[in-house]
């Protein structure tokens, strides 16, 4: 077990696959830094790459704060003490800024489902970060995806069963599913 670990993701519809990833990473470290990417969807860096789905506005309906709250409440609900993790912005689109948010002596825990996952591992290693791939799976092996969660919200389907209870509660209390349906 390492002292400090880190993970990163968009978490645009925190789902059970994200929780599997977060909880496995937490098992491997005493303190976990959770980096949230695309924290400023209006950033010029994001706009320059808007042709990629992960940078399009409709793929990013939840604000940084909303995602921070969903993650925090879901991690605590899962039994992780609040003092054992933190959540920070994570500028994957501007890698040279990452050290402003995550110290260089952490171990990044990654999962790989596609080339984008491999690219992130490679980018972090080039920057001098130690990485550990927790698993590599095919896209078909995903528990679910944020895309699927958002699609079910838009269609009035059963998105709730794909998300942690605390995240569902937060979404419903703040009527966030309406943001996805716009």
Task: Describe the residue ranges of each PLM region.
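Nucleotidyltransferase catalytic core that binds NTPs
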Residues: 1-182
